[in-house]
Amino acid sequence: MITYSWRTTLAGAELGDVENLLEQAVEYDAEAGFSTATPAATGGGEVHHLLVSIAPPGERGSVALDRLPDVPVVAYLRLDVRGDVADVQFVVRPEFRSHGVATLLAELLDEQPTGWSSIAGVRRLRAWAHGAHPAAERMAGRFGAHMDHALFKTLRFIGGSRPFVGDEVGAAVEPAPDGPGEMVEGHLAGIAPGERSVLARGRTRLATPVGSVLVGVDEKDPAAQPACVALDPAGVTAGDLRVLLANALLRVQADGARVAQMYVDALSEAFVGASRELGFQHDQSDLLYVRPL
């Protein structure tokens, strides 16, 4: 039913086909915040692109599949290899989901010499599932992957009739042109464009004696768009985290925000506890799966 082929680079019509697939998926997945892929991004290691095709209508072995459009690429996978670990980004064209494409592809990549075994040295796969993706847990269980890490996307409503009230600690205000870094490796590579745009607002650093936090609001309409709050909890006590988060909320609230968005390391008890005490509410979970080959 499906075939696949590896590429070390994408260009011309093939790159256009992949970009079209991703545009369709991003629009379809906008509300859910599912993972996307970045075919043109510069990788930190060896990059492989996998293009998945399907037989033309009338030859797919299923009336339901035969009704779907005749397109050159039905799924795209990017593999970034560093040593014996490969980071996976994978997207199926929306019309072809729930038809077994991902499951069949995973089986073929396991079984065929042109699959995973053709990528020299790879012993583990890492893949982020952004949001409550319906296939992620099922695929992980079927193919022996385990959850290795998790980040919570949280929201804190502020301003208006429900303003945040807290004690402000003196902070030096500094530019942070690079924006927030990755809390866990690989998390930002396949993050949805809408989530990436929120993080991109975090270009102001509030530096205090106990640490620093990045903040920022939408320049055009701060009340309508989520503000960014971002910090790395490593080495910061729960009490100091509360101080930093209170400062951040007071700042973005003063700048006109009505909701603040922040990613929380789910494995940090101090960070989870501090965020809850400050009123941040869980919105979605991003899960990192690891699969040995």
Give the ranges of each region predicted by the language model.
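Hydrophobic multi-pass inner-membrane translocation pores used for secretion
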Residues: M183-A207, G211-L293
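Short, surface-exposed, charged/polar-biased interaction segments
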Residues: Y4-R7, P39-E46, H146, G160-S161, ...
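Generic low-polarity alpha-helical segments
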Residues: V18, L50-V52, V101, T154, ...
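Acyl-donor-binding surface of acyltransferase catalytic domains
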Residues: R82-V85, F96-G170, L244-Q253, R258-L293
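Conserved donor-binding loop and adjoining core beta-sheet/short helix segment
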Residues: R7-A13, L22-V122, R126, G131, ...
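Short amphipathic alpha-helix that is part of the acyltransferase structural core
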Residues: M1-A40, P163-E195
